[in-house]
Amino acid sequence: MTRIVSTAVGRRPPALSGDRKVEILGVAGAGKSTLAALLGRGTGVEKAAFIHARQPSHLAQMVRSTPRLLPVLVGGLTRTPRMTWPEFKLLVYVTRWRLFLRRSMPPRGVVLLFDQGPVYALVRLKAEGKPFTTRRAFERWSEEMLGGWAGELTGLIFLDAPDSVLWSRINERPQGHKQKGEEATTGLDFIARYRRSFEDVLRRVEELGGPRVLRFDTGTATAVQIAEKVKPLLKDRRG
């Protein structure tokens, strides 16, 4: 199980001078959005936009992503179960958002904070295990995208908790979740599958020389406690 740590694993420090991009990620019920909301209230932090198909500028990114995604789309649309619209949006998000965000970066010194950002999107695609994710075209795309984002992000915050805590939160929180109300064995299998995918992707990020990963156990630490530990890295620290 993860725990609060003062140090982090990885090759690069979690905050660098100049543009800084930090992603919060973790298994369902770990408290990602709660922590993101706390950090987002502070000065010097701006939450990164996610993809919304109703915005014309985002629709343009979908069109521009098609040539690069075509080999992946062929596999996703010709084999059942087929790729869903949300999965397509995740593919576009991971493919185009580095370029998209560079056009509207916050002022120097302001941290761009991702709540379920590009690394999470890659994990979700892999964890869902659709047939198109087993094809060579997806593997090549995934490796290329992960390498790009590993060089773009300056910090990763990974939240986890014991299985029983995560499962209880999924069922008790007001917002919906596809595992909510399912048998416990089904829910615990879901948690384990996603955790394995997170660990696989984070291990690859480290191998690619990506940012350090700060790990916290939200079963023993509150979001406020974690935020207090993270805030100094988002403000004044330099790599």
Features from the language model and the residues they span:
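ATP-dependent small-molecule kinase phosphotransfer cores
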Residues: R54-R136
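NTP-dependent small-molecule kinase module
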Residues: S168-G239
